[in-house]
Amino acid sequence: MAMPSLSACSSIEDDFNYGSSVASASVHIRMAFLRKVYGILCLQFLLTTATTAVFLYFDCMRTFIQGSPVLILASMFGSIGLIFALTLHRHKHPLNLYLLCGFTLSESLTLASVVTFYDVHVVMQAFMLTTAAFLALTTYTLQSKRDFSKLGAGLFAALWILILSGLLGIFVQNETVKLVLSAFGALVFCGFIIYDTHSLIHKLSPEEYVLASINLYLDIINLFLHLLQLLEVSNKK
């Protein structure tokens, strides 16, 4: 059996250095990275979908969670704490995977709690629209040769506008304002799906698959939530 050359071994080691991007790695490394990212993402959404379905379709769970605001806040702040921990320890294996599991569970509980306040049909519509948008945007970005890194500054500026507008929206209860903010938010996170899909190939290293999956997971969750609110407000008009 032939042994790999020293130059081949060296190039593989270089591929895994955090300073090199996935795009500069070998085809084998790139494909392995993508399998890890989207494999983790699929597992995250299986857990999230299953948790949401239990809370949505079982009246006892729906009633319990709607009467337990402390639990909703605990899962929300738990998600925030775990995402900060993941950011700090994203290179520490297997700690990053344990934190990823904890974050996904906490975020699933948070999302499941939110959807209990919406009609089942609206939730299903938002789910289907989110899935279709994610698949279309991912396919487009991975096949495109355009440089989407230029979107970054504009998207982060739009995100801050969205956050500040959302805070103002708490005090201004207007259906038209909610509709506009929901549509704007959905567009912003469609942009983030394109940006983060491009970034996972051109900015992240082959060992940062946990960070890549978290970025995409959060993009999809936020897109879903904005579409959910958009559909809810639209149905009231």
Curated annotation (Swiss-Prot):
It is a multi-pass membrane protein. Its main location: host cell. InterPro entries: Bax_inhibitor_1-related. This is Golgi anti-apoptotic protein. GO terms for biological process: negative regulation of apoptotic process. Residues 210-230 dip into the membrane without crossing it. The gene is L6. Residues 59-67, 116, 173-174 are lumenal. GO terms for cellular component: host cell Golgi membrane; membrane.
